[in-house]
A protein has these predicted regions:
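C-terminal capping alpha-helices of c-type cytochrome domains
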Residues: 1-20, 108-137, 141, 151
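The canonical Cys-X-X-Cys-His
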Residues: 4, 41-56, 118-122
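Extracytoplasmic electron-transfer domains, predominantly the class I c-type cytochrome c fold
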Residues: 4, 68-127
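Electrostatic cytochrome c docking/interface patches
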Residues: 10-46, 60-61
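A short secondary-structure junction motif
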Residues: 11-15, 55-59, 64, 80, ...
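Short acidic alpha-helical/loop segments enriched in Asp/Glu that coordinate divalent cations
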Residues: 19-24, 54-71, 133-134
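Terminal, low-structured helical/coil segments at or just beyond the last alpha-helical repeat
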Residues: 146-156
């Protein structure tokens, strides 16, 4: 435990407590002047995502799972092994922010339009539904604007 704490102190040397570190977090979304287009997103997915996440969003399983403990080399993006409808990635804005900041892996070259479109495409696919989602937001004044759960108190 002491070694872990010493390592954490070493990592944070030169930073104020609570300071933002370059590369931390996701970029602020640059909204489109149009709706996200899942059809365009499907074309982007085929060209830039399917090689890693599978043609049908099934992901690529790790053949060495027993040794590594990592079930997927690249995660499933829809279907039973993917995130459910309560996950942050299922929210269009949050998902697009993540996609913009990280995809394709090692390149992060998608435009905001591409990020929104491919996120809309991915989230249009079947996945597990989180039960009782309305209970996630008993106070609608703090519900994120890109949640698909009504009633809507945010003008959208």
């Amino acid at each position: 435990m002491r070694a872990m704490i010493a390592y954490m102190h070493w990592l944070s040397a030169g930073y104020e407590v609570g300071a933002k570190v370059k590369g931390q977090g996701l970029p602020k979304a640059q909204f489109l002047d149009r709706a996200a287009n899942p059809k365009k997103g499907g074309e982007i997915y085929a060209a830039k995502c399917a090689a890693c996440h599978g043609e049908n969003g099934e992901g690529i399983k790790n053949e060495g799972f027993a040794q590594s403990g990592d079930y997927y080399t690249f995660p499933a993006l829809w279907g039973d092994d993917s995130y459910n409808t309560g996950a942050g990635m299922y929210r269009l804005i949050e998902g697009a922010r993540y996609v913009k900041a990280t995809m394709p892996k090692g390149d992060a070259s998608l435009s905001w339009e591409e990020a929104f479109d491919v996120t809309a495409y991915i989230n249009s696919k079947p996945r597990k539904i989180k039960p009782d989602r309305k209970k996630d937001f008993p106070d609608l004044d703090v519900k994120q604007m890109d949640m698909d759960v009504g009633p809507y108190n945010d003008g959208f």
